[in-house]
């Protein structure tokens, strides 16, 4: 593709950090960059605990396991989600309960959450989709009233805030992704974050093959655990990226605004919108085509390919997949509607104005 969908921003800073990690990061120094990354990211988020993991999926799996979620439990999440959000629920033997999204935020609808709660509900997962921020105040109030944990999937929300508080830091715990497509990257990677001391300690134990930090005997686990730890070399990339985080988030926001400005005059196209009191980290610009145009990603696929533009579809509702749901939940009207009419636009950090103009002009020519 001439204009790729996404790619990371890697400079000599990252290269130097990695070279150092490879040179000296062994033996009793094997976790130096990992420890530094956790501390630096905690400082950035203004949160007490960060546990760096091999993926956001792993971080979510650890967190849900630490909450004690298992067979017979229900976890409420939005039908519009990437599969990584639902997979840990299934692996733990719990039942995912899929509800509709808010048409303005594209995130889980608190009204639908309230309607879906039963005596088996153990958690609500709020995914901050594409950098948009969920209605956390309402969700946390619901969680408190029903004694249900509210979890934040902030995989796509680095730089996103509500009332100047970072997405991922408001619920019982949050998770982040540092995949190569994300705003900051470690190649592959994720993080579990929380202000809950006990939960953080349990997650660290689970993430170390069930071995507690307080156990004096070597190779002596106290429970069956996991191994989702991020490598020191990956963490070195992350440490370098964190020195540039304001630059990287700011560039993503510039790109979203460039698309917004370029498409503003087209009455049939709308973009990601910031809700009141929120700041979007702008991970992924999405254009939504008016219903009256009867077009979406499927209808424009060949046009994009011919122009060398690597655009992508909006996330399909999870209830489409038989391993998640017995049948599509068509009552989740907004999830199914936006899926058909929305398109992810190229937004890598080094995209040029000319490349964005190519995408903008293509949309204007096809949607009119």
Task: Kindly label every feature range from the protein language model.
Residues 1-26, 346:
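N-terminal "arm"/small-domain region of PLP-dependent enzymes with the aminotransferase-like
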Residues 27-74, 88-92, 98-100, 165:
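Phosphate-binding glycine-rich loop
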Residues 33-39, 44-50, 111, 115, ...:
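PLP-dependent aminotransferase class I/II
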Residues 51, 76, 97, 149-151, ...:
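Structural detector of well-ordered beta-strand residues that form the stable sheet scaffold
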Residues 59, 81, 345:
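Conserved SAM-binding loop
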Residues 65-154, 161:
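PLP-dependent aminotransferase-like
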Residues 152-186, 215-222, 270:
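Conserved active-site segment immediately N-terminal to the catalytic lysine
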Residues 169-211, 232:
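Active-site PLP attachment segment
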């Amino acid at each position: 593709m001439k204009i790729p969908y996404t790619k990371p921003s890697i400079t000599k800073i990252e290269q130097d950090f990695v070279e150092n990690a490879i040179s000296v990061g062994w033996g009793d120094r094997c976790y130096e960059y990992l420890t530094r990354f956790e501390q630096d990211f905690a400082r950035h988020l203004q949160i007490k605990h960060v546990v760096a993991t091999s993926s956001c999926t792993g971080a979510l799996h650890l967190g849900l396991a630490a909450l004690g979620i298992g067979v017979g439990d229900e976890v409420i999440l939005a039908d519009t989600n990437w599969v990584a959000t639902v997979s840990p629920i299934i692996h733990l033997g719990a039942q995912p309960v899929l509800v509709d999204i808010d048409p303005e935020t594209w995130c889980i609808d608190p009204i639908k959450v309230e309607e879906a709660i039963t005596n088996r509900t153990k958690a609500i997962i709020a995914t901050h989709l594409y950098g948009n921020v969920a209605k956390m105040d309402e969700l946390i109030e619901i969680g408190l009233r029903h004694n249900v944990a509210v979890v934040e999937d902030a995989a796509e929300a680095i730089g996103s805030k509500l009332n100047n508080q970072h997405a991922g830091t408001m619920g019982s715990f949050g998770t982040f992704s540092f995949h190569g497509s994300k705003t900051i990257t470690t190649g592959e990677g994720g993080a579990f974050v929380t202000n809950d001391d006990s939960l953080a300690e349990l997650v660290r134990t689970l993430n170390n093959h069930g071995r507690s930090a307080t156990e004096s005997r070597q190779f002596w686990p106290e429970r069956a655990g996991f191994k989702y730890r991020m490598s020191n070399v990956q963490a070195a990339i992350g440490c370098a990226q964190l020195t540039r985080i304001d630059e990287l988030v700011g560039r993503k926001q510039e790109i979203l605004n460039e698309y917004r400005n370029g498409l503003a005059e087209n009455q049939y196209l709308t973009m990601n919108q910031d809700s009141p009191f929120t700041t979007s980290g702008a991970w992924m610009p999405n254009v939504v085509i008016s219903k009256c145009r009867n077009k979406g990603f499927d209808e424009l696929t060949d046009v994009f390919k011919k122009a060398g533009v690597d655009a992508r579809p909006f996330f399909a509702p999870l209830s489409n997949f038989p391993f998640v749901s017995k049948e599509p939940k068509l009552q989740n009207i907004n999830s199914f509607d936006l899926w058909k009419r929305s398109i992810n636009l190229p937004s890598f950090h080094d995209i040029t104005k000319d490349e964005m103009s190519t995408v903008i002009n293509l949309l204007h020519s096809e949607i009119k």
